[in-house]
Amino acid sequence: MSDLHNESIFITGGGSGLGLALVERFIEEGAQVATLELSAAKVASLRQRFGEHILAVEGNVTCYADYQRAVDQILTRSGKLDCFIGNAGIWDHNASLVNTPAETLETGFHELFNVNVLGYLLGAKACAPALISSEGSMIFTLSNAAWYPGGGGPLYTASKHAATGLIRQLAYELAPKVRVNGVGPCGMASDLRGPQALGQSETSIMQSLTPEKIAAILPLQFFPQPADFTGPYVMLASRRNNRALSGVMINADAGLAIRGIRHVAAGLDL
């Protein structure tokens, strides 16, 4: 039996991409899974696909009341909450400082930080009492942009660096009751969109990046799928497998940190 059997897991942005892969994986692990999802169509799809195995709540991660409504439903359904996974986010399609108009930069900043940073903070606030009670955990999705430049423009990169600070501070404030960690995936097949303020709300990440382009920059030389990143979340959520980690960011970057100066990888001819 899985360590996560009957554990109550709350994931934001579970309707597509990494969020959907996390929903699938935690259901496979036997967990009771809930998600807060902005898209009504994706909520309907989740309910149709997973039936009684999913509690799908339509709502916005920038709205505390929506979080509270979701947590109330989770506690009614499961009687507890063991892990909150803040995952919903938006990207800026590498919008640069020089090429972004000042007024767009300002509105884009507020929209992107509201989702990527405030959304995590509001989720933590809504989930904290239940997680303190269960001595559970929080996990936040980061990005390779939390470590390196070039994984987005200045707005996205700054938001992911801000999220690392949030993780450390929450890990400090909530210890010893709640473990707080992060996972930073690299580029993957995803429906990740951009801010409406930048005119990117209908543009997905795969319209800006090709599988070949992503694979070429990774030392492991493959195009990651969302399911490739779910393992670290499962480990961090498990009390048996993670008793000791808090304030830790797992850099799941397919080897970006070890790219060579002369070659992406030294073993390409092996």
Swiss-Prot record:
Which GO-annotated molecular functions does the record name? 2,3-dihydroxy-2,3-dihydro-phenylpropionate dehydrogenase activity
- Would the keyword Nucleotide-binding be found if you checked this record's keyword annotation? no
> Can you tell me which residues bind NAD(+)?
10-34
Which sites bind substrate? Answer: 143
Annotated catalytic residues: 156
One biological-process term from Gene Ontology? 3-phenylpropionate catabolic process
> What InterPro entries does this protein map onto?
BphB-like_SDR (IPR047950), Dihydrodiol_DH_HcaB (IPR023643), NAD(P)-bd_dom_sf (IPR036291), Sc_DH/Rdtase_CS (IPR020904), SDR_fam (IPR002347)
For whether the record's keyword set contains NAD, the answer is yes
Question: Could you say which EC number(s) this protein's record lists?
Answer: 1.3.1.87
Q: Which UniProt keywords are given for this protein, alphabetically ordered?
A: Aromatic hydrocarbons catabolism, NAD, Oxidoreductase
Listed pathway(s)? Aromatic compound metabolism; 3-phenylpropanoate degradation
Q: Catalyses which reaction?
A: 3-(cis-5,6-dihydroxycyclohexa-1,3-dien-1-yl)propanoate + NAD(+) = 3-(2,3-dihydroxyphenyl)propanoate + NADH + H(+); (2E)-3-(cis-5,6-dihydroxycyclohexa-1,3-dien-1-yl)prop-2-enoate + NAD(+) = (2E)-3-(2,3-dihydroxyphenyl)prop-2-enoate + NADH + H(+)
Question: What is the similarity comment for this entry?
Answer: Belongs to the short-chain dehydrogenases/reductases (SDR) family.
Purpose of the protein:
Converts 3-phenylpropionate-dihydrodiol (PP-dihydrodiol) and cinnamic acid-dihydrodiol (CI-dihydrodiol) into 3-(2,3-dihydroxylphenyl)propanoic acid (DHPP) and 2,3-dihydroxicinnamic acid (DHCI), respectively.
Name of the featured protein: 3-phenylpropionate-dihydrodiol/cinnamic acid-dihydrodiol dehydrogenase
Q: Which species is listed as the source?
A: Escherichia coli O8 (strain IAI1)
Identify the coding gene.
Answer: hcaB
